[in-house]
């Protein structure tokens, strides 16, 4: 899948899929352009 950046209270990290929990915001490269 497309690498996604997960942003949460613990910081920002990369994930290959959805972020764990609803307290994270997912940013995918295909959505950014």
Swiss-Prot record:
GO terms for cellular component: extracellular region; nematocyst. Disulfide bonds join 6-28. It is found in: Secreted; Nematocyst. The keyword Disulfide bond applies. Its main location: secreted. Pfam families: Defensin_4. Keywords: Disulfide bond, Ion channel impairing toxin, Nematocyst, Secreted, Toxin. Gene3D superfamilies: Anthopleurin-A (2.20.20.10). GO terms for molecular function: ion channel inhibitor activity; toxin activity. Belongs to the sea anemone type 3 (BDS) potassium channel toxin family. This is Toxin Bcg III 25.52. It comes from Bunodosoma cangicum (Sea anemone).
């Amino acid at each position: 899948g497309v690498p996604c950046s997960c942003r949460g209270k613990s910081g920002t990290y990369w994930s290959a899929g959805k972020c764990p929990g609803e307290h994270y915001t997912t940013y995918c490269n295909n959505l950014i352009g």
